[in-house]
Amino acid sequence: MKEISMEKVEAARQAMLETVKSKSLTHEQKVATMANHADSLLSVLDLPEGLLEVLRCEPEKQCICDLFEGNAPMRPRYIIPDYEKFFREGSAFLQVEPPKDLYEAINALQIFYKHVPSVTNYPVYVGQLDTLLNPFVQDMDEELAFKMIKLFCIQMDRTILDSFAHANIGPRATKAGRLLLRAMAETKDAVPNLTLKYDEELTEDDFAIEAIRCAMASAKPSFCNHRMYSKDFSGNYVIASCYNGLAYGGGAYTLVRLILSNIAKRAKDRKDFLEKELPYIMDLCVRYMDERIRFIVEESGFFENNFLAKEGFIHRDRFSAMFGLVGLAEAVNILLEKEGKDDCRFGHSKEATELGVEIMDCISAFNEAHKNPYCEVSNGHFLLHAQVGISTDVEISPGTRIPIGEEPENLADQMEVLSHFHHYFPSGTGDLFPIDRTIHQNPEYVLDIMKGAFQKNLRYLSFYSNDSDVIRITGYLVKKSEMDKLKQGKSVLQDTVALGLGAAENGKILERKVR
């Protein structure tokens, strides 16, 4: 372990004291924050030379961001347990038997969730809930089953204090799936996040319509292109956290992102960006990711000691890493401005789209050339990820999205631009569409949009009503009423509310074009 300066120690001590005295943090939030402060005092990774200049620097010069994973990673960032195995076999460590009815199934899940770690300290994947619960509701009184599932949803919202917790349903309709949609439409809570795996050949229209009505009420589910993800992951995938596609029974060691807009600022012109600045930053980024992965696998002891691995709920060789990026739109605009083409804007110009594709091809080729020995599930490569942004991002659009306020007037034109980029990102990308309240009377309109988009190989879509209290910030959900409370200095239950408030203030997320 490397030495650190007393200046850093004193800064950490001061931050700890401020955390203790905070009037807006709950006890649980203080405990988690104190752990992060303690982690900041460690220095155990062998960092590539030059990394800190673009990682730990002023925001306008930062080109690489590790999304607060800490200096000494003690577990993978995202963990995707095999819940079906848990239901089949139970767990010796947790002293839980395989469930025999809905009471036991829900109780077992509630116990299990408490013991699934992640970067947020809460589970980022809570299971394919429709198929998990469906066997137990077949012979039950439907209203009793509904009440139990509704209470289960409420319990998750009040105890999993982070809206990156994500459930999946679909693609086929089930009795449990319909009960879950009914419950979430009624509760209108931020947790859990929810995705419907949609396939036009497998998902009945009436089930999709039911899901759209739920989304208009509660901003969930989102909809993923099941056919596309199944191809990328040989059928065995989940959607976790925001909209992260990951292998079942595995997960992601780490997620580190490129800030493309700031990399573009370093470049003299397009050629300098593509041939010098971008490759240089990407090389630093992947070597940093390699070192984080090495430490988790070889030194942390997680896969040797955690019951999830010891009992076979996760497998080390089903983990990969997420090579993220933000700010493609701004990078394109900056590079075109350097060429005197101020009128060529991302989302409105064929040349801008073509430059965006050229940049993505460069990143994709670099990733394909890089190998990591511990990413067997993805053939030794990292998974590209269009990262959703963080609360402190200013004039940096998530992933490959068109900047808020610059969306094309015609939705079809926006979809056309997006269709050039979604295919690059097996570990997740997505776009958000606030929908006018009148669409509540015509959910078929949204279904038609979705069918057309998925036929164009878009990967992931989210819709929510423009008058809903629950809104989708980037990939996660927050209540506007909770953000208002936090803004007034009051404590709130979920830590993602603070992220949502920051995104509202810095990222203009409340100003998206309503469709």
Where do the protein language model's features map onto the residues?
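Terminal accessory/anchoring regions of large secretory-pathway or extracellular enzymes
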Residues: 329, 349-353
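Well-ordered alpha-helical scaffold segments within catalytic/enzyme domains
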Residues: 330-338
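Non-catalytic, well-ordered alpha-helical scaffold segments
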Residues: 127, 279, 325-326, 357
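Conserved phosphate/anionic-ligand binding catalytic regions in large, soluble enzymes, centered on
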Residues: 124, 315-331
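Short amphipathic alpha-helical coiled-coil/interface segments
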Residues: 355-367
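Conserved catalytic cores of very large enzyme subunits
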Residues: 2-317, 338, 344-349, 365-515
